[in-house]
């Protein structure tokens, strides 16, 4: 029985690796210094943040679209502002307390948790209305994200 050559053994993983080399990821993000954001983005983010402290900035590219997330904190609660490259606000994620949730959302999260640990809960606002509530649930060493409409219906993944 002959042994395969080293070239043959390495060629399969190498071809697999190179096959994806030219394909950009669907979603990529990186932390960037806030002063490097476009002027309009920084100006609108600061106006939206009001008196909150800016913790950091993230540059995101998803499906070819560039956006920026400005992470803020006020009174111990996080609030993240997502803006497009022109400075228009796309959405705001704001930490909320469990007792502030609509009853249907609280019930949906409790049901999804199945006794697991519920992480920080955020409201996601698009335009002038809350579009969804998001959280993470950790159970048996597994962590998963869940999202619900304000009426408590599950939000389908994009």
Sequence positions of predicted segments:
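Long, terminal "pre-/pro-" and other extracytoplasmic accessory regions
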Residues: 2-158
């Amino acid at each position: 029985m002959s042994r395969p050559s080293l070239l043959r053994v390495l060629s399969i993983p190498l071809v697999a690796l190179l096959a994806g080399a030219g394909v950009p990821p669907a979603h990529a993000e990186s932390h960037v210094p806030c002063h490097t954001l476009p002027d309009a983005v920084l100006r609108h983010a600061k106006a939206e943040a009001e008196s909150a402290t800016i913790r950091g900035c993230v540059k995101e590219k998803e499906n070819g679209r560039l956006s920026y997330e400005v992470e803020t904190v006020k009174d111990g609660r996080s609030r993240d502002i997502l803006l497009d490259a022109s400075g228009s606000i796309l959405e705001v994620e704001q930490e909320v307390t469990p007792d502030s949730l609509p009853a249907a959302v609280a019930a949906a999260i409790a049901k999804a948790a199945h006794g697991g640990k519920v992480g920080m809960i955020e409201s996601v606002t698009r335009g002038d209305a809350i579009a969804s509530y998001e959280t993470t649930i950790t159970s048996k060493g597994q962590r998963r994200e869940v999202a619900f409409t304000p009426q408590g219906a599950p939000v389908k993944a994009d």
